Amino acid sequence: MKHRYLPATEKDKQEMLATIGVSSIDDLFADIPENVKYKKEHQIKKAKSETELTRELTKLASKNRDTVQYASFLGAGVYDHYQPVIVDHVISRSEFYTAYTPYQPEISQGELQAIFEFQTMICELTGMDIANSSMYDGGTALAEAAMLASGHTKKKKIVVSKTVHPESREVLKTYAKGQYIDVVEVPAADGVTDLDALRQTVCENTAAVIVQYPNFFGRIEPLKDIEPIAHQGKSMFIVSANPLALGLLTPPGKFQSDIVVGDAQPFGIPSAYGGPHCGFFAVTKKLMRKVPGRLVGQTEDENGKRGFVLTLQAREQHIRRDKATSNICSNQALNALAASVAMTALGKNGVKDIARQNLLKANYAKQEAKKAGLTVMFDGPMFNEFVIKLDEPVRAVNKRLLAKGMIGGYDLGLTYPELDCHMLIAVTELRTKEEIDALIQELGDRHE
């Protein structure tokens, strides 16, 4: 054996060459012209031993900063939430430890039941009739919802509020470009969708209106006022929602939304450099056969026992091909399982309690910011995020906060040029009063 990771012996190589009918490695690559072959020695450094490599990688990893060492006030779509210990134990079981839906699904009854429970809990949170097995993330779920709306209504205009996550809007534009769909953005007014601008933008050619709940600035959009505007001209109403916030807020289904999407990251999925996540997709019953992705249904076998199957597969691209709603042919089964385990471990009361803690702690932070003389923007109903205006660039402030053991908020100037020197602060249930007070004191001292 010449190499611990490439164990083929000379005898093995000769047997393989003989099997394919050549006598040497050079003969194997004879079809490659000599003038394009690289004949010099590769200048590669001497390999490190396993011990040396472990030491080197540990040294590099120690440069990372995480939310265990640092109090994080960074949100903007990825949040530092409580993760029940049981989540990792369950998803690490060999029966579940795959990100993929099995190709012989009915054999994997445990996996299908877990997905079915995920779908059920998403329906309970959103107030919708049907949910799929998951999508890649919240952004792709939103884009898929827009494509469904355009295909269902036969219209080519999507109206989306600028208070929707900017990265989700970019994903939407990418999807829309290939389908020749126009994406029109509606401006914000005091941190929520400008209703007058929305009325002027929606027309008979509008396939859907998309808003976020709570929106990117943390504000609670008035869905009751937006819904009739969205549905004028028979367009569809799409809501991108934070599932944890739905533990307290009225579910979008109560406001006659047609599609509710979002990201299940708040439930049992770590921030992990921004992914992977787990999108969810829920609809009314009339759109059941237009839903992208996989659907798990409950049934009975020939002996009358309860069982689970992948159902309504004729919708999917491996059968309908170009007529399918979507080309998605996978999901985030492992992360959906993590979300399911987290929601189950918390229970209904636990979800409500954590949502309430987010609301109360964020509002405490906002009130303390006002007392410290900081300028709080877009004041109004919120969930766990709010915006403050700073006297200097957010990057500079965050650098100082990091030195004090805190991860600062999101720099809104990165995606909203008009909001340069504005910070989006997220406060979750994991933040303590002492951590919040330390943040406000640091921000307030610099403000003075």
Curated annotation (Swiss-Prot):
<dbReference type="InterPro" id="IPR023010">
    <property type="entry name" value="GcvPA"/>
</dbReference>
<dbReference type="InterPro" id="IPR049315">
    <property type="entry name" value="GDC-P_N"/>
</dbReference>
<keyword id="KW-0560">Oxidoreductase</keyword>
<dbReference type="InterPro" id="IPR020581">
    <property type="entry name" value="GDC_P"/>
</dbReference>
<dbReference type="InterPro" id="IPR015424">
    <property type="entry name" value="PyrdxlP-dep_Trfase"/>
</dbReference>
<dbReference type="Pfam" id="PF02347">
    <property type="entry name" value="GDC-P"/>
</dbReference>
<protein>
    <recommendedName>
        <fullName>Probable glycine dehydrogenase (decarboxylating) subunit 1</fullName>
        <ecNumber>1.4.4.2</ecNumber>
    </recommendedName>
</protein>
<comment type="function">
    <text>The glycine cleavage system catalyzes the degradation of glycine. The P protein binds the alpha-amino group of glycine through its pyridoxal phosphate cofactor; CO(2) is released and the remaining methylamine moiety is then transferred to the lipoamide cofactor of the H protein.</text>
</comment>
<dbReference type="InterPro" id="IPR015421">
    <property type="entry name" value="PyrdxlP-dep_Trfase_major"/>
</dbReference>
<comment type="subunit">
    <text>The glycine cleavage system is composed of four proteins: P, T, L and H. In this organism, the P 'protein' is a heterodimer of two subunits.</text>
</comment>
<dbReference type="InterPro" id="IPR015422">
    <property type="entry name" value="PyrdxlP-dep_Trfase_small"/>
</dbReference>
<dbReference type="GO" id="GO:0019464">
    <property type="term" value="P:glycine decarboxylation via glycine cleavage system"/>
</dbReference>
<dbReference type="GO" id="GO:0004375">
    <property type="term" value="F:glycine dehydrogenase (decarboxylating) activity"/>
</dbReference>
<comment type="similarity">
    <text>Belongs to the GcvP family. N-terminal subunit subfamily.</text>
</comment>
<dbReference type="GO" id="GO:0009116">
    <property type="term" value="P:nucleoside metabolic process"/>
</dbReference>
